[in-house]
Amino acid sequence: DVADMMADSMADMGAYIVLAFAAAHFIAMFEWSNLGSIIAISGADLLQSVGFTGLPLLFSFILVSALINLFVGSASAKWAIMAPVFVPMLMLAGEPGYSPETVQAAYRIGDSFTNILTPLLPYFPLVIIFAQRYDEDAGIGSIIALMVPYSVSFGVVSILVFLVWVLLGLPLGPGAELYYGG
């Protein structure tokens, strides 16, 4: 009986195992080919050649992070995809380049203020259930429409605080400088 129950439960895992295998294969090939390094170095060279560095670069990275957040729900999955390319790219783009801590702080800002706007947020169904306590017609569209002003306000304030922080040259924490190399 136990063996049959275990076999039945593993039958449901087949699609996940195949997906995990494909994802692991993609990650291994990405690492083996050094494609992340090639994209990062080429991207940094391109950014420097067109003079796109400094605060506009950080601001753009925040917006890219926010845009990707609308389509990829997991923060750790987004960081796993973005970090191998963007951390070295922003470290190399500009003199001095941004430290990994600064890049991650910018990523977290972009990731944070669009969370409530994506239906991929794991807690979105819970938000809808709570909203329907007060408005039975509340749904995905009405929740997103209601949250846009809050999200935009939170995003603008967060970005401004971060950019002022960078302009003042304040460290992000003990031993966490803004720029690569201190």
Tell me the role of every PLM-derived stretch:
Residues D1-I38:
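Core transmembrane alpha-helical segments of multi-pass membrane transporters/permeases
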Residues S9-M13, I17, L46, V50, ...:
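Loop-to-transmembrane-helix entry motif
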Residues A20-A24, Q48-M89, E101-Q104:
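Hydrophobic alpha-helical transmembrane segments of multi-pass integral membrane proteins
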Residues A20-A28, L58-N69, Y150-L167:
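Hydrophobic core segments of alpha-helical transmembrane domains in multi-pass membrane transport
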Residues A28-S37, I68-I81, T114-P122:
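Short helix-coil transition sites and intra-membrane helix breaks within transmembrane domains
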Residues L55, G94-A106, D135-L146:
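Membrane-interface alpha-helices at helix entry/exit sites of multi-pass transporters
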Residues D111-G182:
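Juxtamembrane and boundary regions of transmembrane helices in multi-pass small-molecule transporters
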